[in-house]
Amino acid sequence: MENELLNHPHNNNMVNGHQDAPYDALSMKNDAEMLEQIKQLLMENNNLKETMKQMNQEMKERLEELLKRHNQHLLDLNSANEVLRKELQSLKEKIATSNQGSAVCSTSEEASENKQLKNQLTRLQAEKADLLGLISELQLKLGSFSEDSFVEIGFSERESGEIVNEEKANKILSDHNISYRTNSIKEEGGGTEPEEVAISRLLRSLREETQKVERLEKELFSANKRLAELEKQTSEFCDKGVQTEQESEQSQSEVIISSEVDILKEKVKSLNKELQETNDKLNEAKQFKNSLQEKCILLDKRLQENQVDLEEKQSLRYSIKKLELQVESQESEIKLEQNKTEAEKNQLGILQVSYDKLNSEYQELRIREIEKVSKVEFNELLEKLDVCEKALAKKQFEIDEMREMDTKHEEDKETIELLRAQVDVYCADFHAERSARENIHQEKEQLATRLAYMIQEYEKLKEEMMGKQSIEQLQRRHGATSLLDASEGPYLVARGAANMEQPSITVYTCPKCNLTVPDMDTLQIHVMDCIT
């Protein structure tokens, strides 16, 4: 349809005798440029969609890695807590054996200390249960992500009994079933909203993880305090046991307890190091989050630009449809006019046949009258006949001219309507291009002003740096000479007064403090220092 629009006016103009080839060439160029721009916009949209898909996949992979690391860290903490609990139980058993050896002297004190140790053990076990509960809450909150967050964590806990034992902890750890599930990317039109929701949920999960890490640090600090208290109590208990008869056995138990306490301290230090590593990983996740936010901002800008381009495309499609409808209407009008011309041709054929009949009859009548009338009348009739033929020829010529003018007018009407439609399209394109060029020109002017301002500032800074460097070089070069001249100033002035007859010697003096200087460079440096 577009090729018909572009070629049809050209043919009509050639029929009418007018040559509008440059105008048609410009229209062809503009249409080709518009088609190229539309293709470029479609390619850019496809590229943006591919980049969005790649970004989504990268985010999914990074989230899966972070969740795996977090779960591994939780499992390590649980195992460390179990080891600590076992060591505390072994310490308790050793203390109980040592208490049985010294039960003869201090049964009441040992019973009270045993009760305290039992209470502390129950507290530690309760704290361990709280830690396991926190871990389960963490995994529940991580599992509460929807399909848009690309990760789903499900787990089932088996807990029974009042105090958490090793077997129950192992069951809980074995029953944590982590399943990762990636979400399918939505269609091209509506891919921005789930990504924003996923990013916001990721930010929330990162905040919750940082808060939980802080809680774990506090709990580790409290556990360290309790371990210190246990160490103090064991040391006190050892001091009391020294007074008993079994000094050798108690000394051995003290050595064992101190070694075990050192081992516990080392394990606590390792746990602190692991916490620091988790904090570093969280910082890396925050940096990755910031980079993702920047990328999302860039993608939003690109989407806005694509929306503007899509609106322009829709307007172009609307104009193309409008032109197609106009072409169809003009084709229907052309068909009607062709039918009219065929009917007129049929009428002309009928008139021509009748004219031929009349002419033949006229010739026969003329021959008969010639035979009848005289020569004078014959001549008069011939003259009249010539006049009538001339009049008929004139009328026929005028009729032909009127027909040609009518056909030309009809063709001119068609060309005028097509040209008007093209002029409307070209005007719309011209206004759009002019507005775009004005915007580009304004942006160029703003960038040029900024560039000139930055160049001026750069030149100023460069001049200042060059001046400072030259002054520093001069100061380094003539620093020693200025000090010597300051000490020998009066002597040089007196000598200059004595030798006024020597015109070749030039004396450089400061106008403020009357200090004589051997060089102009040192004088400039001294004047700058003296004025400041």
Curated annotation (Swiss-Prot):
**PROSITE patterns the record matches:** ZF_CCHC_NOA (PS51801)
Gene Ontology CC annotation, any one: recycling endosome
Where is this chain primarily localised?
Answer: cytoplasm
Per the record, the gene is: optn
Q: Which UniProt keywords apply?
A: Coiled coil, Cytoplasm, Cytoplasmic vesicle, Endosome, Golgi apparatus, Metal-binding, Zinc, Zinc-finger
Can you say where in the cell this protein is located?
Cytoplasm; Cytoplasm, Perinuclear region; Golgi apparatus; Golgi apparatus, trans-Golgi network
Q: Where are the zinc fingers (CCHC NOA-type)?
A: 502-532
- Pfam families in UniProt: CC2-LZ, NEMO, zf_C2H2_10
Tell me, in a sentence or two, what this protein's role is: Probably part of the TNF-alpha signaling pathway that can shift the equilibrium toward induction of cell death. May act by regulating membrane trafficking and cellular morphogenesis.
| Domain of life of the organism encoding this protein | Eukaryota
Q: Can you supply a Gene Ontology BP term from the record?
A: protein localization to Golgi apparatus
Molecular function GO labels: K63-linked polyubiquitin modification-dependent protein binding; zinc ion binding
Q: Which PANTHER family match?
A: NF-KAPPA-B ESSENTIAL MODULATOR, OPTINEURIN
Coiled-coil annotated residue ranges, if any: 27-143, 195-466
Protein name per its UniProtKB record:
Optineurin
Q: Which InterPro entries match?
A: CC2-LZ_dom (IPR032419), NEMO_N (IPR021063), NEMO_ZF (IPR034735), Optineurin/NFkB_EssMod (IPR051301)
Q: Where does Zn(2+) bind?
A: C510, C513, H526, C530
